[in-house]
Each structure stands twice: as C-alpha cells, then as structure tokens.
C-alpha cells in the first residue's frame, strides 16, 4: 500500500532512488517500443504525485519524469503528462517537461492556466463522476467550458482522470 511505500521512501532514500532509476529505465524502454510501433503521442501518468509533498516530488521524482519525457520528445513524439493531485506543483510544469499537462478535476482550469507555463497546453479537468449525471446536465456542464476554450485554445477537452468502471455507456 502507498503509506508503506512512502514510509520506505523516508527510511531508505538511497534504495528508493535506485528503485526509481530502474523503473525509469523500464518506462523509457516501454515508451521507445510504443514509438517504434507508430504512436502519434505519449501520455505519462503519475497518479500518485499528489500524495507526496510538492518539494519532495520536485526534488526526487520530477528529474526522473524529465528523463522519460526527454527520451520520448527527442524522438519527435508530443508528450502529455498527467500528475494527479499536485495542485500548486503545477507551477513546475514548463515546456522542458511536456507539451501538454493533464489537469485533474480537483484543480480549476483557470488556476491551472495561471500556474502552468503558457507554452504548455492543458488537457482534462472534467470530473469523471459527471458522466453519471443526466445527459442534459452533462451537456450544460460541457457548454460552460466554451468560454475557457475561446480564451485558451491550447486545451484538450477530457476527463480529469479515467472513465469509471460503471459509467453508463450512453454518457
């Protein structure tokens, strides 16, 4: 479980760094295989980023994320980076990190746009639970995003996380 992993990180920093380096190398290998098989874009998910203090994440994990993103982008593939729950840590997202950053539903698009470098596009932010609402309400909510898109055309409409397993297919 994550609490035990986080404790391990604090108790065994060097071992954690070694483990993260090994996982990073595997991620780069995986991304390279995806590129070799013809992907048009790559999305890197860091679903647990928000469980760590921002300073710790920036110091210990963002450099490894950048190794992965550099490997992908050096092959001419655009990269979308998803950091769930990081909130104010979005200010560390620059064009050197990614082309687009996915925003979870816990951070407003307006706040994200103010924090993230203007050359980095935004994706997401729609609460996956919205898809349980009546279709009329879904349409109204999506309509409310038009104003943001008109001011910030480098936004990709998307959920702020994955589709939930029991989401009605019609929605």
Model-identified regions with their sequence ranges:
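Active-site loop segments of alpha/beta catalytic cores
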Residues: 1-171
